[in-house]
Amino acid sequence: MHLCYFDENKHGPDNPHFFIGGLLIPDKKALDFENTLSQIAFNFFGARSLIQANELHGKELFHGKGNAKGRKLEERVQVFQDIATFVTNNQIPVRMVCINVERHKNKYQYPMPAYRLGLMLILERFSEYLEQEDDLGLVFGDYEADEVTGAVVDFSEYKSQGKTPMYFGRPLAGYGVFHPVASQPIFTGGRFAGLHGGSL
């Protein structure tokens, strides 16, 4: 089984691209990976406690705000480097979706909301990987009060239909520390591409 963690950014006039993406963690390696991430958090925060104050979120680290406020740039960059090394060395699959929200709205007469479209597409990408690996997956995401109800309905519909409703129509079979880390590829991917995906 793979544990599939996803996160998304907040889009708006200053940030027109909606990013959603995540990591697929093999369950057999989850505890070892958690220990590594706890060490990275300890190196930065001086604590291993699984509390919000010790979460490694891309936005706060990049801007030096929130729980990274007052920390030196070199220290914050080191966390990004450590996470990138961790993901790369462990060959952790990363999947991302980027939607230009205005272009999407203008392309269709009745466009699907960006969050629902992005959720559908990231589930398709997770499913595609799991199918290649001949494995099952368990998906974890944020509790977004304004969007969670629709997302739960989407999950339910995708499950009952056995696949997502459009685009690739990929089949969706059966149905702590990794989720904040899932925000980092989204944040850095958007920044690297110059598409301002960094407002997680």
Regions found by a protein language model. Name each.
Residues 1-200:
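Phosphate-ester processing/binding pockets and catalytic centers
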